[in-house]
Amino acid sequence: MLNQIKKDAQDRMEKSLEALKGHISKIRTGRAQPSLLDAIQVEYYGAATPLRQLANVVAEDARTLAVTVFDRSLISAVEKAILTSDLGLNPSSAGTTIRVPLPPLTEERRRDLIKIVKGEGEQGKVAIRNVRRDANDKIKALLKDKEISENEQHKAEEEIQKITDIYIKKVDEVLADKEKELMDF
């Protein structure tokens, strides 16, 4: 029973870490990354469709993304979707390929992005701590129901804390990497 609680807590903490990585990867650095356009939805036959389903996105060089649209008739819709996104990008089309140059980030914008990254990181840490609290509550419930001893409870809570510390450290590493990426480019 305790092993199941620990496994469940670790799985949920891993999901929180992956969610944080996903959120942070969408934050634009000066470097061209295809994942930057993942959140863009294109109006396609009356429905909002993810850009990834309608086009291939690759990094052409350090500051340019190339979007190759599968259906020529969608080029203007894809261009409009990129232009109206809140990413501040200005696409230009050439044949079936849309080039998206990334403007360099100003120092002020970099600092704003770092604040956003830190906020996302804090939310990730809160999510991990909530998982720890839930696991500890389950352990206390087992103690209350006399299914485990106090020694087992303390040992299990210490193990949950160790797992929590590991994931908090991983969050800090992800944040440090993203901050470095934002400031270096």
UniProtKB/Swiss-Prot annotation:
Protein keywords? Cytoplasm, Protein biosynthesis
Going by the entry's taxonomy, the superkingdom of the source organism is recorded as: Bacteria
SUPFAM superfamilies of this UniProt entry?
Ribosome recycling factor, RRF
A biological process (GO) annotation for this entry? cytoplasmic translational termination
Location comes to:
Cytoplasm
CDD domains per record: RRF (cd00520)
Q: Which family does it belong to?
A: Belongs to the RRF family.
Q: What is this protein called?
A: Ribosome-recycling factor
